[in-house]
């Protein structure tokens, strides 16, 4: 997270998570853009903040893999929609995309007897969160 975001008011992510727990679905690109605008954040800053919050909550045992993975998938779909809307030269937000990839790696059993979440997702998230300790 850059210093510009740290100097801004932190968005009320608790309200987002409360809505998600009550069954609210992130409604896509328009919702993210509206929420970002309401909190004077860029969409990239919001996607990164949400993704880091999900990763932190999952690693702290506050979210199940299924819930965290579902949110990561939704955020990735929004990232892809933005990429299509912006065309050539658009870069996916980091660490949001890396967090999506970490959860994606835990989605399927490779047949080697290991838990893919423990073997792939958790180490990747530890590395990402170590690189972003301010979250």
Q: Which residues make up each language-model segment?
A:
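Acidic, Ser/Pro/Thr-rich low-complexity regulatory regions
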Residues: 1-135
